[in-house]
Every structure is written in C-alpha cells, then in structure tokens.
Swiss-Prot record:
Family: Belongs to the RecX family.
GO BP term, pick one: regulation of DNA repair
Location of the protein in the cell: Cytoplasm
GO cellular component terms given for this protein: cytoplasm
Key words of the record: Cytoplasm
HAMAP family the record matches: RecX
UniProt xrefs under InterPro entries: RecX_HTH_1st (IPR053926), RecX_HTH_2nd (IPR053924), RecX_HTH_3rd (IPR053925), Regulatory_RecX (IPR003783), WH-like_DNA-bd_sf (IPR036388)
Function: Modulates RecA activity.
Record's protein name: Regulatory protein RecX
Keyword match rRNA-binding: no
Superkingdom in the source lineage: Bacteria
UniProt keyword Cytoplasm present: yes
Length: 271
C-alpha cells in the first residue's frame, strides 16, 4: 500500500506537498492535513488518494468562486465560466456552484432583480437592453421576464432621462424637433420601447423656446449658407432649405432665414 514518505511546506501559506513512496503525489491544505491526519508513514489506499484529491479540488473551486463573488454579485453562468478559465474540472465546478446555491451565495433570481435595480438607480439601459445583457450572463428567459415584470413603467424614467439629459444643453444649437428626434433615437438605442420613450420625453424638461429656436436657426442656417457658398444662388438656397428641413426646422422658419429676416446673408458671406 502506498506510504507517505515526506511532507513539505509550500511557499503559499497553509499549503503542503505530499510525497508518496519518495515521489511528489499531490498538495493539500492545512485543514485537509489535519482532518485526514496525514503524517509521514501514513498508509493510503488508491481510493484514499483519489478521495483526498477530489476533496482538495472541490475546496479549491469553492475558494476561487467565493473570491470571485467577493467583488460583486455574479450569475451562476459567470461563476462557471470563471472556474473554467482557471482550469477547474467540470465536476469540481458544478459541486462548488451547487454548494454556493444551497448557501444562497448564488441565486439567479436575486441577481436579476439586483442587476435591474442597480440600472434603475445609476444606469442608462431600457428593458430590452437589460434583457439582452442578462441573457449574456446566462440567465434563463423566464427568470429575466419575471424580474422585469416587477418593475413599473415609471421606474424606468430616471434611467431614460440619464440617456437624454445632455440634449437639453443643445437648445439654441439644434432645432426643437431635431433635439426631440435625437432623444427618441438615443432612447430606442438604449432599449426603451415606444411607450417608455414617449413617457421619458414627457418628463424631459424640453420646451420649445422661441428665442432658442431662432438662435439654433441662425447657427444651423449660417453653417449651411457658408457650406454651399460655391453654388449659384438658386441652387445654394435649395441646398440650404433641404439642410435646414432635415435638421427639424419648419418651412416658415426656413423662409425667414433665406429672406434674411434672421441674419443678414451678405454678412455671413463676409466671414
């Protein structure tokens, strides 16, 4: 029967190398060393050796997983992926995860709720983007939908406002219509559906101010007028008209600019 012929300490605190029949066999923790009463001269069957190795592998997997969880909450899938990257066997990984689930350190239902609540508090994602991100973290569709179902529409407003807040400062630079369109586009890109996007825009402090609208028309119109300065007059005005229309200005506002009522067009040409 195999016999322990030597036990030496590792550089890592609390770890020991076990030599059997004068050859290195495996390493164990101080806890395993004490619990198994592993001493020089101890006889071990092959079954004993395999049992010790398995216990060490399971213990190492749990320690790695606990360390990973100490930084922030994780999904079951994330923990399994992390252990896999650290070359932990599938059996040890599954055992560790099951242990952590039983201890309630891992719970995908709680993880989904916490992820959503954190997004509502400081994030900028709408339901569709949250759904996609949680699926990337390996959560089942029914778990995600159950967590999303618990959230009222009004609770998404703050996240939506964080998406579009910077556009408020574009007043006087862009037309009211263009600002609203940009806000709509950003909200949809961040996963807000039509109904939620409309709700956010209702809450957005964005009112059509005539002075700011005229200032935006002056800036955008002057920019376009200079851009097409090489074109003959009729073609130039047509291009400017198209440019301003695409940027959200009404026909009346565009005509006012082209008639020189907003700014003297000849003065623009001098710059």
């Amino acid at each position: 029967m195999p016999i322990i012929t030597k036990i030496s300490t590792q550089k890592r605190k609390g770890r020991y190398n076990i030599f059997i029949d004068n050859e290195y066999a495996f390493s164990v923790s101080e806890r395993t060393l004490a619990e198994r009463r592993l001493l020089k001269g101890t006889e071990l069957s092959n079954e004993d050796i395999e049992e010790i190795k398995k216990a060490e592998a399971d213990s190492h997997a749990i320690q790695l997983a606990m360390s990973y969880l100490s930084y922030q909450p994780r999904s079951v899938y994330e923990v399994l992926e992390y252990l896999n990257k650290h070359e932990i066997s599938q059996d040890a990984s599954q055992a560790a995860v099951q242990n952590l689930i039983e201890l309630n350190y891992l719970n995908d239902n709680n993880f989904a709720r916490l992820f959503i609540k954190n997004n509502l508090r400081v994030g900028k994602d709408g339901p569709r983007t949250v759904d996609r991100k949680l699926k990337q973290k390996g959560l089942a569709a029914d778990i995600i939908q159950e967590a999303l179902y618990e959230i009222e529409d009004e609770e998404w407003v703050d996240a939506g406002l964080r998406v579009v807040h910077s556009l408020i400062h574009q007043a006087g630079k862009l037309s009211y219509k263009e600002i609203k369109q940009k806000a709509w586009t950003k909200l949809r890109a961040h996963g807000f559906d039509q109904e939620l996007s409309e709700l956010v825009l209702e809450k957005l402090d964005l009112e059509k101010d005539e002075d700011e609208q005229i200032e935006a028309l002056k800036k955008q119109g002057s920019k376009a007028w200079r851009r097409y300065r090489k074109d003959e007059d009729f073609k130039r005005k047509q291009k400017v008209k198209r440019y301003l229309f695409q940027h959200g200005f009404s026909s009346g506002e565009i005509d006012s600019f082209l008639n020189g009522e907003i700014v003297d067009l000849e003065e623009i040409d001098e710059y």
